């Protein structure tokens, strides 16, 4: 049997769009260790543009980055996906970049 999250694909014409920038808090432990990278989060955005669920698709374990990425996405409001002008709840993948200045 396939493992992993049971993600149903819901067709849509326009994907959800963040209303504001996704701003993760860079964990101190990762900064001190000089860890950079991209965490890919799969998120369910409901028809009101709220983030209902988050799962790590591609993470950087044991650095705090996965949690920081999910937290940042949970705090972001989205314009919901549209299917034929109707708002629909959908799963999308969102890459969150962690770059040291």
Name every feature range the model reports, one short phrase each.
Residues 29, 33-40, 45-82, 89:
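A short, well-structured alpha-helical segment
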Residues 19, 57-58, 97:
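Residue-level detector of conserved, well-ordered beta-strand and adjacent loop positions
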Residues 16-17, 65, 69, 100:
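Low-complexity, compositionally biased segments
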Residues 80-101:
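Cysteine/selenocysteine-centered motifs that mediate thiol-based redox chemistry or coordinate metal-sulfur cofactors
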Residues 1-32, 71-75, 94:
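Acidic, low-complexity proline/glycine/alanine-rich linker and hinge segments
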């Amino acid at each position: 049997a396939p493992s992993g999250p049971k993600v149903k694909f819901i067709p849509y014409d326009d994907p959800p769009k963040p209303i504001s920038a996704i701003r993760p808090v860079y964990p101190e432990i990762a900064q001190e260790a000089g860890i950079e990278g991209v965490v890919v989060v799969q998120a369910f955005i409901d028809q009101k543009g709220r983030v209902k669920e988050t799962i790590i698709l591609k993470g950087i374990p044991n650095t705090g980055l996965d949690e920081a990425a999910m937290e940042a996405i949970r705090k972001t409001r989205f314009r919901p996906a549209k299917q034929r002008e109707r708002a629909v709840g959908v799963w999308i993948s969102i890459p969150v970049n962690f770059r040291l200045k």
